From Swiss-Prot:
The keyword Electron transport applies. It is a multi-pass membrane protein. One of its GO terms (molecular function) is NADH dehydrogenase (ubiquinone) activity. Its EC number is 7.1.1.2. It comes from the Eukaryota. One of its GO terms (cellular component) is mitochondrial membrane. Core subunit of the mitochondrial membrane respiratory chain NADH dehydrogenase (Complex I) that is believed to belong to the minimal assembly required for catalysis. Complex I functions in the transfer of electrons from NADH to the respiratory chain. The immediate electron acceptor for the enzyme is believed to be ubiquinone. This is NADH-ubiquinone oxidoreductase chain 6. Keywords: Electron transport, Membrane, Mitochondrion, NAD, Respiratory chain, Translocase, Transmembrane, Transmembrane helix, Transport, Ubiquinone. The chain crosses the membrane at residues 1-21, 27-47, 48-68, 87-107, 138-158. It is found in: Mitochondrion membrane. Belongs to the complex I subunit 6 family. The gene is MT-ND6. It catalyses: a ubiquinone + NADH + 5 H(+)(in) = a ubiquinol + NAD(+) + 4 H(+)(out).
Length: 172
């Protein structure tokens, strides 16, 4: 089980690197799907099945919208692939920054600990609902900030896709 969780963590990091160094929206969405599946699988392996399912459904809906808009904006007949030297350079640069951050910060700052509510014997399902309660009690500010950011992103994408048309107002 430890190796499986380590594999999911590695897939999550590689998916994030694929999104950060995406040469084309066609390949960037593959990185998004890989990162979201690995992250939700990671949560599922920790026993947080409800939150994992909700996040997976939200990620799939959001990724579908972002993929459709980004493909409509950048319809290249010959998209760059991940094997191009420019893209490989971006990926190596991101890995170098990640390794430098670990070397400078050290591994001690990652010891956040784990707090469980009631995960003994038959009550292991309580852990999942305790996490949902923590989302809405302590994480309400982050939810509001994330919702505001997503709303702003939606309007920015809609404005970019609209182009020069004025909607119902016509030029005289």
């Amino acid at each position: 089980m430890t190796y499986f969780v380590l594999f999911l963590g590695l897939c999550f990091v590689l998916g994030g690197l694929a999104v950060a160094s995406n040469p084309s929206p066609y390949y960037g969405v593959v990185g998004l799907v890989l990162a979201s599946v690995a992250g939700c699988g990671w949560l599922l392996s920790l026993g947080i099945s409800f939150v994992s399912l909700v996040l997976f459904m939200v990620y799939l809906g959001g990724m579908l919208v972002v993929f459709v808009y980004s493909v409509s904006l950048a319809a290249d007949p010959f998209p760059e692939a991940w094997g191009d030297w420019r893209v490989v350079g971006y990926g190596m640069g991101f890995v170098a920054v990640l390794v430098a951050g670990v070397v400078v910060g050290g591994f001690e700052c990652w010891d956040l600990g784990m707090v469980t509510v009631d995960s003994v014997g038959m009550f292991s399902v309580r852990l999942d609902f305790g996490g949902v309660a923590m989302f809405y009690s302590c994480g309400v500010g982050m939810f509001l900030a994330a919702g505001w950011g997503l709303l702003l992103t939606l309007f920015v994408v809609l404005e970019l896709v609209r182009g020069l048309t004025r909607g119902a107002i016509r030029a005289v």
